[in-house]
């Protein structure tokens, strides 16, 4: 299966920092050359301190979000603790692989903070899982995003610095990838809290970037 045929029209980014993680996505949804939405949601909270970004089929992505939300809540009720990020990634990987003959056309980033610290996993449509220890990007704009991430990332980055880098990477992708654009949705997760940035805060950071 050629993932590039389906995993398009999106740029999502994940950055692991010393004190948490940042997940970000632009919000354009396309149908061929038609811009179907300028406010599409692609970053979902799936547990108290875990979130997931989606690239690919909107319907498949929403089904997976519902599934992982239910499974993570059931786990918490039964064990009185949250699933680890690796546990959630493994759950999703197994589910995607079980549907490999009728694959869900998605690519996911699952990230957050658990007892083992901050982390991000990248999953393809067949459930292949790769732990990205520092930076991740998916979607049609990912080559441009990776250009920024690999050039400017530092291992000692704080969440504040990672936030600026993630927005810069998405911003750079939207300038070159016609299927990525509009607003940027950003989530910051530390061991203390899950926070989705206000659109005005994102605009302020974006406006400060070099033209």
Curated annotation (Swiss-Prot):
InterPro entries: Ntn_hydrolases_N, Pept_T1A_Psome_bsu_arc, Pept_T1A_subB, Proteasome_bsu_CS, Proteasome_sua/b, Proteasome_suB-type. Its main location: cytoplasm. Its EC number is 3.4.25.1. Transmembrane segments: none annotated. It is an enzyme of class 3 (hydrolase). The active site is at residue 10. GO terms for molecular function: threonine-type endopeptidase activity. It is found in: Cytoplasm. It comes from the Archaea. SUPFAM superfamilies: N-terminal nucleophile aminohydrolases (Ntn hydrolases). Residues 1-9 form a propeptide. Keywords: Autocatalytic cleavage, Cytoplasm, Hydrolase, Protease, Proteasome, Threonine protease, Zymogen. The 20S proteasome core is composed of 14 alpha and 14 beta subunits that assemble into four stacked heptameric rings, resulting in a barrel-shaped structure. The two inner rings, each composed of seven catalytic beta subunits, are sandwiched by two outer rings, each composed of seven alpha subunits. The catalytic chamber with the active sites is on the inside of the barrel. Has a gated structure, the ends of the cylinder being occluded by the N-termini of the alpha-subunits. Is capped at one or both ends by the proteasome regulatory ATPase, PAN. This is Proteasome subunit beta. The lineage of its organism: Archaea, Methanobacteriati, Methanobacteriota, Stenosarchaea group, Methanomicrobia.
């Amino acid at each position: 299966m050629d993932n590039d045929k389906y995993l398009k029209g999106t740029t999502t980014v994940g950055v692991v920092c010393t004190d948490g993680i940042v997940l970000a996505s632009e919000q354009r949804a396309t149908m061929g050359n038609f811009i179907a939405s300028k406010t599409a949601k692609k970053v979902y909270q799936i547990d108290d301190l875990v979130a997931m970004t989606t690239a690919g089929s909107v319907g498949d992505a929403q089904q997976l979000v519902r599934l992982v939300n239910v499974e993570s809540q059931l786990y918490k009720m039964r064990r009185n603790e949250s699933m680890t990020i690796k546990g959630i990634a493994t759950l999703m990987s197994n589910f995607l692989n079980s549907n490999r003959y009728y694959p869900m056309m998605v690519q996911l980033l699952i990230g957050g903070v658990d007892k083992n610290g901050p982390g991000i996993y990248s999953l393809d449509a067949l459930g292949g899982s790769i732990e990205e220890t520092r930076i991740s990007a998916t979607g049609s704009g990912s080559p441009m995003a990776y250009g920024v991430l690999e050039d400017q990332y530092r291992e000692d980055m704080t969440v504040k610095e990672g936030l600026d880098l993630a927005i810069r990477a998405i911003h750079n992708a939207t300038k070159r990838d016609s299927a990525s654009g509009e607003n940027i949705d950003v989530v910051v997760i530390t061991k203390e809290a899950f926070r989705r940035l206000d659109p005005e805060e994102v605009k302020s950071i974006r406006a400060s970037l070099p033209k």
